[in-house]
UniProtKB/Swiss-Prot annotation:
The lineage of its organism: Bacteria, Pseudomonadati, Pseudomonadota, Alphaproteobacteria, Hyphomicrobiales. This is Zinc import ATP-binding protein ZnuC. It is a peripheral membrane protein. GO terms for molecular function: ABC-type zinc transporter activity; ATP binding; ATP hydrolysis activity. ATP binds at G45, P46, N47, G48, S49, G50, K51, S52. Keywords: ATP-binding, Cell inner membrane, Cell membrane, Ion transport, Membrane, Nucleotide-binding, Translocase, Transport, Zinc, Zinc transport. It is found in: Cell inner membrane. SUPFAM superfamilies: P-loop containing nucleoside triphosphate hydrolases. It catalyses: Zn(2+)(out) + ATP(in) + H2O(in) = Zn(2+)(in) + ADP(in) + phosphate(in) + H(+)(in). The complex is composed of two ATP-binding proteins (ZnuC), two transmembrane proteins (ZnuB) and a solute-binding protein (ZnuA). Part of the ABC transporter complex ZnuABC involved in zinc import. Responsible for energy coupling to the transport system.
């Protein structure tokens, strides 16, 4: 769902042809995207595709080996990690979790806990929280310092379907109330947060980008998941003009094979996200029950 109102907003961070190399190997390269105030950008891709590395470049944790990263002066970042190491043998309340990296006024803690719907769990032990409650606690911790940019690494990991919908709705409300930019990382290649403005698919580089399509409004879907799910989730259709082979090489739509896949190797992205897909989707390009288009399987 494209929010055109964000187009003219202040850019918080931008990456231009950015990449990170470690021990002679590129973790990711040729990354280009920006996040503006009030905008939601979602990075998707398989494990090891460079999603977290790209996010770390954006917030300054990882230094680019090539390209450029620009950030708004004085940018405040709130970060929800994919994993948080906690010694579960030590007592740790939700309120104490909020101040692990520095003191916070009680009113700010209470406001953040209220905003994430867990004020009643302020004194609960973290180890006793459900997956969804723990993610809400991490979100509360991230927004308590009023960030300009909120970076969420797999925020719905370990949460069931109804919890995923509730968390995406919460993230939308946080964006709307705080007008912060959101950079969201997701392991799901095909279903994304419906409020996402831009989806960027990575696999060591930018494979494709576009906007999510609304989730199916079929009676079967509505009967199974209800209208709330349709508002929270959306399907993203990949438009790749190449295939990643098991040995790491890249096969292009014309049949040629190269050792790498850079922007000049044949990527082209139209405004609507269509970019000369090399996949065979069948006559109508329908989606299979697993969310992939008919005939599409990622290598």
């Amino acid at each position: 769902m494209l929010h055109s109102a964000h187009k003219g907003n202040e850019i918080l961070v931008s990456l231009a042809n950015a990449g990170v190399q470690r021990n002679g190997r590129w973790l990711v390269r040729g990354v280009e995207f920006s996040v503006s105030k009030g905008e939601i950008v979602t990075l998707i891709g398989p494990n090891g595709s460079g999603k977290s590395t790209s996010a770390k470049m954006a917030i300054g944790v990882a230094k680019p080996s090539e390209g450029k990263v620009s950030r708004k002066a004085g940018l405040r970042v709130g970060y929800v990690p994919q994993k948080l190491s906690v010694d579960w043998t030590m007592p740790l309340s939700v309120r104490r979790l909020m101040t692990l990296t520095g003191p916070l006024p009680a009113r700010e803690i209470d406001a953040a806990l209220n905003a994430t719907g867990i004020a009643h769990l302020a004194n609960a032990e973290v180890q006793h929280l459900s997956g969804g409650e723990f993610q809400r606690a991490l979100l509360a911790r991230a927004i308590a310092r009023k960030p300009d940019l909120l970076v969420l690494d797999e925020p719905v990991q370990g949460v069931d379907f109804s919890g995923e919908i509730a968390l995406y709705d919460l993230i939308k409300n946080i964006r709307n109330s705080n007008d912060c930019g959101i950079l969201l990382i997701s392991h799901d290649l095909h279903v994304v947060m419906a409020e996402t403005d831009t989806v960027i698919c990575l696999n060591g580089h930018v494979c494709c980008r576009g906007t999510p399509q609304a989730v199916s409004q079929s009676p079967e879907y509505m009967r199974l998941f209800g209208g709330t799910a349709a508002k929270a989730l959306a399907v993203y259709s990949h438009h790749h003009d190449h295939t990643h082979l098991p040995d790491g090489r890249v096969q292009h739509a014309d049949g040629t094979v190269t050792d790498h896949c850079h922007p000049e190797d044949g990527h082209h992205h139209d405004e609507d996200g269509e970019c000369g897909c090399g996949h065979d989707h069948g006559e109508h390009g329908d989606h299979a029950p697993d969310g992939l288009r008919q005939g599409e399987r990622h290598v």
